[in-house]
Amino acid sequence: MEGGAMMLLEVKNVTKKFGDKVVLKNISFTLEEGESLGILGKSGAGKSVLLHMLRGMDGYEPTEGQIIYHVSYCEKCGYVDVPSKAGTPCKKCGNELKKIEVDFWNDKKYTYNLKRKIAIMLQRTFALYGEKTVLENILEALHQAGYEGKEAIDMALKLIKMVKLEHRITHIARDLSGGEKQRVVLARQIAKEPFIFLADEPTGTLDPQTAKLVHSALKELVIKNKISLILTSHWPEVIAELTEKAIWLDKGEIIMEGTSEEVVNKFMETVKEFKKPETEVEIKEDIIKLENVSKHYCSVERGVIKAVDNVTLNIREREIFGLVGTSGAGKTTLAKIIAGVLPPSKGKYWFRVGDEWVDMTKPGPMGRGRAKRYIGILFQEYALYPHRTILENLTEAIGLELPDEFARMKAVYTLVSVGFSEEEAEEILDKYPHELSVGERHRCALAQVLIKEPRVVILDEPTGTMDPITRNTVAESIHKSRIELEQTYIIVSHDMDFVLNVCDRAGLMRNGKLIKVGKPEEIVALLTEEEKQEMFGQK
């Protein structure tokens, strides 16, 4: 930082235990006013726990150590600002601001006012009023920050412009896409006029193109305005792009700190790129046949929507097939038809069970019901049973009745195949979903699909929450299980790098139509500039 920058935050020898489990161990670092810090690490390294602690969330108090904030404070009205504002008049009441040092978890007198000025963005959790419009959501936050009347409207419009949502002002929040919701959250948090901004994997589950929009909004609103930023990510590129210095967290400990570039380079040395196995796999005859399949919806605003439009496709047994295209191209709808979750509006669909072809357009136990048990599917909006342990989620909760010892052994084996070490797998079996990180929950949901040993596995955006190391492990386990369990995979994705690395063939979708089926390299040659932007260059 430039000379004269003031200390804003000190994290001193912090350890956090949940029961006997140490999740953070002896963590120390400092942050100066206006500085940006990245926290990089694999899923489950302790990044989110640390951010929740810095925000003062219930249950996240340090077991040992201190969190110290240095701020300027108005004794009269409780207004909080950055330390360099000490000695200037309070924005609210005109009283002089005093510089204070707050032991965040122990000085209860100041905690409430400080928490109100700490902004936080979490992955997969959108703190919005679902029934209110984008404008109303932002105005609500501005009113809480003391803005009134025309001043509030002007400020709201300025924020909406900065997050590039002018075309969504009157849309209600629950109808927005994930990336749009994140940008409304960002605008609401900036409306608080925070003295520090905490972003926990803010683009962890978004496609690269949408992630870029959120990143540019963060740059515009946080970095340009010199608001101190702490950002966690399992994507090294995000840390390098958005922060000046970084720490690398692994199993709750800091194993390196330095400039973002130094830390990212060191982290990347540990990532071994997955390469398709050399061994030839015998791809068998067709297992799925679609002929002129369509799925139409009626919408008041847009009339008839052709989500899937006249698709003909054959997928062979033991094949790893990629369904690619930009958001809204029809990939997920087609995957739901293949899974037997959605019936097509028209067309024919057969699924082979043994030597018999099942007509998937017919409902009931002799139609779709007969084949569905052989198909496993993991959607983007997966959900584990919150009040059941991970072991129960992998066994009895999904109707898998096994003797105790065998159930445990099979669960560990399956968890190892999705990137956990044997020790980690043993450890999480008796935990509940809320005790795991978002990335760990995603892998458990993937294990929940694989443990049933389906003949066809459909994965919808499987790499969304995965760090590069886990991504490669999952790629490896897909290839392994196709050989050992003779499984067929359909991977629905806009992560073209993953598809190139993993799939034998791919199909490109545009506006509900299947444009081309061929080798992944052939599909890449057909992509438009816009498609390349959305489908390449993770986060």
Swiss-Prot record:
The keyword Repeat applies. Transmembrane segments: none annotated. ATP 2 binds at G325, T326, S327, G328, A329, G330, K331, T332. Keywords: ATP-binding, Nucleotide-binding, Repeat, Transport. Residues 9-276, 288-536 form the ABC transporter domain. The keyword Metal-binding does not apply. It comes from the Archaea. ATP 1 binds at G41, K42, S43, G44, A45, G46, K47, S48. GO terms for molecular function: ATP binding; ATP hydrolysis activity. GO terms for biological process: organic phosphonate catabolic process. InterPro entries: AAA+_ATPase (IPR003593), ABC_transporter-like_ATP-bd (IPR003439), ABC_transporter-like_CS (IPR017871), Me_Coenz_M_Rdtase_A2 (IPR017669), P-loop_NTPase (IPR027417). Coiled coil: none annotated. PANTHER family: ABC TRANSPORTER, ATP-BINDING PROTEIN (PTHR42764:SF2), PHOSPHONATES UTILIZATION ATP-BINDING PROTEIN PHNK-RELATED (PTHR42764). This is Uncharacterized ABC transporter ATP-binding protein MJ1242. It comes from Methanocaldococcus jannaschii (strain ATCC 43067 / DSM 2661 / JAL-1 / JCM 10045 / NBRC 100440). The lineage of its organism: Archaea, Methanobacteriati, Methanobacteriota, Methanomada group, Methanococci.
